[in-house]
Every structure is written in structure tokens, then in C-alpha cells.
Amino acid sequence: AGILIKDATALELLRNVDSMVVDKTGTMTLPPPDGQGEQLKPFAREAVEELHKMGITLYMMSGDKEERVRHLAQEAGISHYKWQVLPQDKDDAVKALQQEGRHVAMVGDGINDSQALARADVSIAMGRGTDVAMDVAQVTLMGDDLRRIPDAIRLSRRTVAMIRQNLFWAFIYNMVCIPLAAGLPYAFGAHWQITPMW
């Protein structure tokens, strides 16, 4: 399963994420096999632990009842959660975190997530989500593996670091070599000159 990042702006924003709002149904959980209750997706807890290690605080939102949301949040290792929320509540939660100066990612897969996805600094959609969610999203994770979320953040951080490193060395090279190639040493009495072809 791959990661699709829409553009360079999304790549830059993704590396700065410090807070993440996740939708429970469909994003964190699988449909109930026996109709009795949802289960966490495979590797959900592992993904949450990786995100915590990266310094990212998670907030789980759900329209479900308190007891069920609390149980799944604790099972996943998420200490911030809200229950019986409406789509507007998710949007308000993202806005409130942004007003605190946080860089917020929203992870969702449904129509009721689209408003919060549009507001977030970075919007992440699961590849099996609705067309609306994937249209709004800046990052799309192909498949249901939640470990792709920390992978996407690591990818963005490494890519931006490599771009900055390359720009630094290109600047140093040009600052030194262009004056040499232009004959600056010759102007100060040196009788050697580097050919511009070098």
C-alpha cells in the first residue's frame, strides 16, 4: 500500500504536524464481523505508539456512545477522545487546536469528515474512503494500514531535510565557484584562472 501526497505544500505542512484528529469509524476501526461491535484495525495501536514517539498528540472523535469510544480509545492508546460528536464538532475541534497554535492533521474517510478535512492544516484520507474525503485530502493512504500515517510523516521530514541540504550545498558551491570561474583571483593579481567550463 502506498502514500499519495498531492503537492509540495502538503509535503512541507505534513512535516510540522504536532496534533492529529482521527475519526473512529472506518479510520480506526473495522466493521463488526458479527454485528456486535467494531474492532480496532490491525496495527492501529502500533501506529498510535509511533505517532506518540514522533511527538504527535492524537484526538479520537466519534458519533458513538461514551462507553464504546472510551474502550476503543484506551485499546488504541489514545488518551484524548470525544463521543457523540457531529461533523461540525470535528471541524470545531480542528479549529480550536489551530487557535492554540498547533499544526493539525485530520484523518478521515467519510462525507461527515470532509468539513474537518478541509479545515485542517493537512488532510489525510484512507484509500478506501469516500470520493468526497479523497478529493479534499492532501494525503491519501492507499489501503487501510494505519502505519502508513507515521510513514508519510517520516517521508515528508526526510524529503524536506534532503531538499534543504541540497539547497545549502548548491548555494555554497555557487558562492565559491562562480567567482573563481569569473576570474576573481585574476583581478587580485593571481595569474591563474579556472575555466567556466569546469
Can you say where each PLM-predicted feature lies in the sequence?
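Membrane-embedded alpha-helical bundles of multi-pass transporters
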Residues: 1, 32, 56, 76, ...
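Cytosolic catalytic headpiece
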Residues: 5-112, 116-122, 154-157, 174
